Amino acid sequence: GVGSTGVHVVDLGLMPIPVLRYKLKGFGEKGGVSFQQVQLVRGMTSIRFFDEHGVDISSAFAKSVERVFQREEFRRVQHQEIGLIFEQPRVLDLYAEAYLKALGEQPFSEQFRLVIDYAHSPAVVVLPRLLSELGCDVVTLNAHTERQEALLPEEIPASLERLATIVRALSAHMGFFLYPDGEKLVLVDDAGTVWQGMGLLALLIALVAESPPANGEVVLPVYAPESFARALQRVGVGVRETLSAPRAMTEAARQKGVLFASAGEGDLIFPALHYVPDALFALGMFLKYASKAKKPLSQVAASAPPVTVVHRTLPCPVEKKGSVMREVTQRLASEKPRSFLEGVKIAEDQGWVLVRSDRLRPELHIHAEAPTPELAARLVDRYCQQVERLLREA
């Protein structure tokens, strides 16, 4: 294994990815690796690499790792130089201390009743302790980690529906569904409404507007609804657009004055603790903002900015991505105002369309915003047809 290359290993065992990232932030290790069952396919394992700051390695570095692995060019050492394996039992204690400190002294003015669906996530090794420290009354679901198979995407809607039913039945203040990696979450308010993806981000913006900071800014992807920027600017909070890639979001979150950053996929970065997606800390921040609002979350939700962005994906072979994106620029966007921060964003009479390539999968993403979801759906469907034609011609 890794020890045969002369590298020492700190074995954290079963641990949420945000805690691993926190461990890497300032304890001297040169990098980290996480192994997790793939959520899309049974029997596959995802291996993720992080640098010494706990940030996803760059795509260029990932390619060099693949090249070294395929050529078997890794270092080999003599038996007396083999790396050692260590354990660090206090990692959870250190994370918990930093977590509570980042939330602040006495962060909540009331005792929250919560329902948490852990989805068999390693978050169960630390989050119950944190919520107990915060004085929350919690009902837990799927808290055992011995499940043999990863949760499939098609199983999630039923889990969310069950969570919403339990939240309503128990008159809980809110419920949370944690994805197995501990980096993304879904929220259910006291009325049983499910908030996920861009909707979750809209709810957070409404909470921020209830008790806006004196200054600061929020980092959003280029395909976020324009209503988000307007809602934030009304309360004096700026908006910065950046790439949706995790590493780009992390770099943007490092800038001074950033309140939070998100790609609108359930991932939330709060620099108060660290510069990476952390569903555990995001949960705590939702509770803090809800406590400041001093009214039910369902009432806060009534002022959430509308989400009128529609998103579609189209299959696209990797070898065709470059040529198709060039054709989009030359044939679909040549006579219209456009920008290229991520993909090609084309201005339309009553909105915009964004065509971008997926970083990992053989897909293209098409986003469109218009005054209503119906108009946005029509706009995105029209561009899907045009891009499909370009794909056939490529």
Sequence positions of predicted segments:
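Phosphate-binding and adjacent anionic-ligand microenvironments
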Residues: 173-174, 213-394
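Predominant activation on well-ordered alpha-helical scaffold segments within soluble catalytic domains
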Residues: 3, 21, 66, 100, ...
